Amino acid sequence: LNGQYRRPTGIVGRIIAGRMAQQHQPENAWTVSLLHVQPSDHILEIGFGPGTTIQRLAMLTSEGHVTGIDYSSTMVSLASRRNARAIKAGRVKLCRGNVVNLPFANHTFDKVLSIHTLYFWQEPLRALAEIQRVLKPGGTLALTILPREKWPGGGTGTEYCIVYSGDDVVKLMLDAGFTSAHVEPCPLPTQFRELSVIGIK
């Protein structure tokens, strides 16, 4: 089952996607708010899952564009149906791919976000360097995670995922070339124990 969270597939993957869409809606909305999205922004979401945050971003970028990349072809299919109208209008583009090899030109995006995916990145430093590459100068990355100290089982992770503290992620971002990075604790009720690390190119 843990492997399904890394790359949801088939019927089980679709069930997990439905659970994710409902369970993570509050922190997804909070993460979007941290980006201070402007109507003309070009935004990338990495690991968009069922596509609910893509849908939210599309509503906020009436003069811009939203791109999503996900490791799971099941999620690409599901999110494409959810966002079919915006895709047809040319305002959203979704594709399957890997964060360590983003198929975008340098300086493409104003903002990038990724929510609950860092744990599954096999090469986090390389991935963050790729994100830094595709961000415009001064662009913002919001990376939302459940930090190690809040992780079930004492923060040891599993064979499928690696867990991090906020400070770990700050260091990774700076090592990847971001000019600054800081931790934003989640202000939502206590059942939401996430934080977001904000990096500026």
List the predicted regions and their residue ranges.
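A short glycine-rich, Lys/Arg-flanked "PGG" loop and its adjoining helix->strand segment in the class I
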Residues: 125-137
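Short glycine-dipeptide loop
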Residues: 40, 135-140
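Conserved alpha-helix/loop element of class I SAM-dependent methyltransferases that forms part
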Residues: 22-41
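A short SAM/SAH-binding and catalytic strip from SAM-dependent methyltransferases
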Residues: 111-124
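Class I SAM-dependent methyltransferase SAM/SAH-binding core
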Residues: 42-101
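Conserved class I S-adenosyl-L-methionine
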Residues: 140-170
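A short acidic, Gly/Pro-enriched loop at the edge of an enzyme's catalytic core
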Residues: 100-111
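Core SAM-dependent methyltransferase catalytic element
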Residues: 176-179, 185-201
